[in-house]
Amino acid sequence: MKVIFQQDVKGKGKKGEVKNVSEGYARNYLIPNGLAVEATSANMKNLNAKKKSEEKKKEEELQEAKAYQTELEALTLELKAKSGEGGRLFGAISTKQIAEALSREGKKVDKRKILLNDPIRSLGYTNVPIKIHPEVTATVKVHVVEE
């Protein structure tokens, strides 16, 4: 019997997949528990419509992320920090401080999305990558100046 999985079922199939399973398994377990529905033509049309709307939604999210990327890349953040000789900072500029500076500019970014390997420990310009979307990464210029 062909069924369309409504949820992931370990070892059998993932959500949205169409598979052949034994009739007893489908009628006695999958369908009553809401894990799958019978693959009728109406259900197949619904599945295709859902897939199309999901693809469209993903495409819109990608376009929004690319637009946000250009906005972020146009920015140059200026952060002030106390420094000693040779431009070395007392302390460091962390992702939290960069996220706060971005929010002051009106750009909301989660600090966990800022891909800074090590905190910034010197004066000057640093390019900081920010992951906006799984496929889109923006690079923001951070200018650290002496306080």
Swiss-Prot record:
<keyword id="KW-0694">RNA-binding</keyword>
<dbReference type="Pfam" id="PF01281">
    <property type="entry name" value="Ribosomal_L9_N"/>
</dbReference>
<dbReference type="InterPro" id="IPR009027">
    <property type="entry name" value="Ribosomal_bL9/RNase_H1_N"/>
</dbReference>
<dbReference type="GO" id="GO:0006412">
    <property type="term" value="P:translation"/>
</dbReference>
<dbReference type="GO" id="GO:0003735">
    <property type="term" value="F:structural constituent of ribosome"/>
</dbReference>
<comment type="similarity">
    <text>Belongs to the bacterial ribosomal protein bL9 family.</text>
</comment>
<keyword id="KW-0687">Ribonucleoprotein</keyword>
<dbReference type="InterPro" id="IPR000244">
    <property type="entry name" value="Ribosomal_bL9"/>
</dbReference>
<comment type="function">
    <text>Binds to the 23S rRNA.</text>
</comment>
<dbReference type="InterPro" id="IPR020069">
    <property type="entry name" value="Ribosomal_bL9_C"/>
</dbReference>
<dbReference type="GO" id="GO:1990904">
    <property type="term" value="C:ribonucleoprotein complex"/>
</dbReference>
<dbReference type="GO" id="GO:0005840">
    <property type="term" value="C:ribosome"/>
</dbReference>
<dbReference type="Pfam" id="PF03948">
    <property type="entry name" value="Ribosomal_L9_C"/>
</dbReference>
<keyword id="KW-0689">Ribosomal protein</keyword>
<dbReference type="InterPro" id="IPR036791">
    <property type="entry name" value="Ribosomal_bL9_C_sf"/>
</dbReference>
<dbReference type="InterPro" id="IPR020594">
    <property type="entry name" value="Ribosomal_bL9_bac/chp"/>
</dbReference>
<dbReference type="GO" id="GO:0019843">
    <property type="term" value="F:rRNA binding"/>
</dbReference>
<keyword id="KW-0699">rRNA-binding</keyword>
<protein>
    <recommendedName>
        <fullName>Large ribosomal subunit protein bL9</fullName>
    </recommendedName>
</protein>
<dbReference type="InterPro" id="IPR020070">
    <property type="entry name" value="Ribosomal_bL9_N"/>
</dbReference>
<dbReference type="InterPro" id="IPR036935">
    <property type="entry name" value="Ribosomal_bL9_N_sf"/>
</dbReference>
